[in-house]
Amino acid sequence: MNLRELQLRPFRLTLRTPLQRAGSGHRERNGLLVTLIDDESQVGYGEATPLVEFGTEDLAATTSLLNELAHRLAHHPLPLTGEDVEELLASLPELTDAPAARCGLESALLDLAAQRAGLPLAKFLSASARASIPVSALLSASEPEDLAREALASIREGFRVVKVKVAARILSDDAKRLIAVRRAVGDEVKIRIDANGAWTESEAATALRGLSPLKLELCEQPVPAANHAALRRLRWQVRCPIAADESVSFPGARDLLLDGEDGPVADVVVLKPMVLGGLLPSLRLARRADALGVGYYVTSSLDGVVARLGAAHLAAAVPKADWASGLAVGQLFEKDTGLDPCPPRQGEIQLPVQPGLGLAANWSRT
């Protein structure tokens, strides 16, 4: 089976409400839909949506590289196994520094390979993949009252974990927001927070100690990404579990995060396929973390439905599902890149049973 054509379609996703994070915010996401068509007209889908602040290339580099590969890979034999996909991508060294481009191309290749194998992508990645995954709700409101209403609505929809962005305002204001959420959802619902690396070590320790009565599930990236020593120290200074997010984005840091001479620096690692270069590198990292007793879960990078669907298959294929994945973000966009075949319901995503990603060959923007 050979590749007949690689198509690229640019898209823009506009957020209904700008999502504030410490130091910046997001109003829109721009990316490329990657479509591979083989010589029997079978279609595989991928998505490349760079996130430069997490260490990916920019959109111009993504576009240039994938356009170049569209010509180079024309009529190239298509891989049949995950190992074959890895081998093909390894033969393209220019993808090493372009994780978003690699993710988009890898997804489309895996989609085709899984379809030919007659397996849903999750089962193609792991024979023991689960049929469904738990997901968290990302809350986007700013004011305590609005945040509480949003949290309560999420719980009524069946979510058991909610996530709140913090550190974009003074600690006392964040405390009021989180107290409002806890009062709204009760004690049984888990609350995780994300500081996006905006606190100093001292600020993080003060904040997490002060917030301890709220029994937070975890804190994502409390200190800057490069400060691994502070992440490790915080694990012993506070009761709240510490998750490495941006810190995982840089390839040279992953060995230090998990295999440093003093052991792992965080309790949990966050797996963003768009940042890590695809599903296969993310799956390897999850298995490595699992062997070391480090937790992990999969999140989107505010991606479109194709990337989120691939990430959901990954979340079903990783060894454990102890932590809810952060993939319930489609409702944040005014319009997605197309219909979502498996939107969250009752706090879970049920994976498609069709071979591959689970998108029809004529899937398109609606």
Predicted ranges, named:
Residues 79-85, 121-124, 218-222, 299-301, ...:
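Flexible, glycine/charged-enriched surface loops at secondary-structure junctions
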Residues 10, 137, 270, 326-327:
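Structural signal for conserved beta-strand scaffold positions within catalytic alpha/beta enzyme cores
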Residues 299-341, 345-346, 354-356:
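Active-site pocket-lining/capping segments in soluble small-molecule metabolic enzymes
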Residues 105, 109-113, 285, 308-315:
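Buried hydrophobic packing segments
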Residues 164, 169-309, 335-337, 342-344:
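Catalytic core of soluble alpha/beta enzymes
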Residues 1-191, 196-205, 209-213, 237, ...:
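N-terminal capping/lid subdomain adjacent to the active-site entrance of alpha/beta enzymes
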Residues 2, 158-160, 215-218, 264-265, ...:
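Short loop/turn motifs at secondary-structure junctions
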Residues 71-86, 251-266, 320:
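Intrinsically disordered, low-complexity coil segments
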